[in-house]
Every structure is written in structure tokens, then in C-alpha cells.
Regions:
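Amphipathic beta-strand/beta-sheet edge segments enriched in Tyr/Trp
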Residues: 95-152
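A short, hydrophobic beta-strand-centered structural micro-motif
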Residues: 51-53, 79, 85-109
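Bacterial N-terminal signal peptides
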Residues: 10-21
């Protein structure tokens, strides 16, 4: 009788341990930023970047001040990062970064300049407060994604 009970206890413990092991979430990869899409490999050799807004460039008089500030913030971040040379004409660019800043959410998208504006974005992130002056987490995520793409 005692042997029957102890074998049931052992079986129950093994089943419980197996269930817990299978149900446990996988730990995140050490090098992958969470929720950051991978940067397109076709653009890792790009050198020139143009920054604009979905509603027009920074010199458009109808552009919202938030979008104008987002353009300047991204331009400053690109210059500090130093991976790309900033250009002020879309025809000179390899990559076009498009921004939109709204109270509810900011957007940063990467386009191949050779198909822009007809083509779809190749990389995009959105987030509340993602393109604020002085701190641009969306640009930081772009840098991380680019660095991971070039490290391969």
C-alpha cells in the first residue's frame, strides 16, 4: 500500500514539473531588442538619408509644428549617430525616414528612396512620445535594429 502511494506521489510531482516547464515563457534573446522589427538587409549599405513628414517636408508652411520638431529631432539623432549622411533633397538619398508626431502616437518609418513615395515602408515603429525633442526612443530602436542587421 505504501509503495503504491509513493509511486503516485512521484508520478504527480513529475507531471507537475513537466507541466510547469512547458508552460514557462521563453526568456528573451540576449541581443534582440524587444518588439523591434528587424532592419531590411537591402538597406544596410545605404549612406545618405532624407528625413521628412507624411504631411510634407520641414519647410512646408502647412506642416504641424509637432511634425516639424520630429523632423529636426530625427535629423539631429542621425547626425549624432553618424552612420548616415543627412541630405536635404529626396533625390540624393538612399533611405527616406518619414515621421509623424501626434499626441496619441509617434511614427518613424524607413523607405527605400529609390521607390519612394510609391513603395511601402520597409521598417516602421510607433509609440507614444517616441520622437520627442532630446529623446527619441524610436530612433534608438532604429539604431539597434540597424546594428543587429549589420552584425550578421
Amino acid at each position: 500500500m505504501k509503495k503504491k502511494i509513493s509511486s503516485r506521489v512521484v508520478l504527480a510531482v513529475v507531471l507537475l514539473a513537466t507541466t510547469l516547464a512547458l508552460a514557462a515563457p521563453n526568456p528573451p534573446k540576449a541581443n534582440a531588442p524587444q518588439n523591434v522589427p528587424s532592419f531590411p538587409g537591402t538597406l544596410v549599405n545605404a549612406r545618405y538619408v532624407y528625413v521628412t513628414s507624411y504631411d510634407g517636408d520641414e519647410f512646408n508652411i502647412n506642416l504641424l509644428s509637432e511634425d516639424r520638431q520630429a523632423i529636426v529631432t530625427v535629423q539631429d539623432a542621425m547626425q549624432k549617430w553618424g552612420k548616415f549622411t543627412l541630405v536635404y533633397e529626396p533625390g540624393q538619398a538612399d533611405i527616406v525616414l518619414m515621421v509623424m508626431s501626434r499626441p496619441s502616437e509617434d511614427v518613424l518609418a524607413v523607405y527605400d528612396a529609390h521607390g519612394w513615395p510609391r513603395n511601402e515602408y520597409l521598417w516602421r515603429m510607433m509609440g507614444h512620445g517616441g520622437l520627442q525633442q532630446g529623446e527619441a526612443p524610436l530612433v534608438t530602436n532604429l539604431e539597434k535594429a540597424f546594428d543587429l542587421a549589420t552584425a550578421k
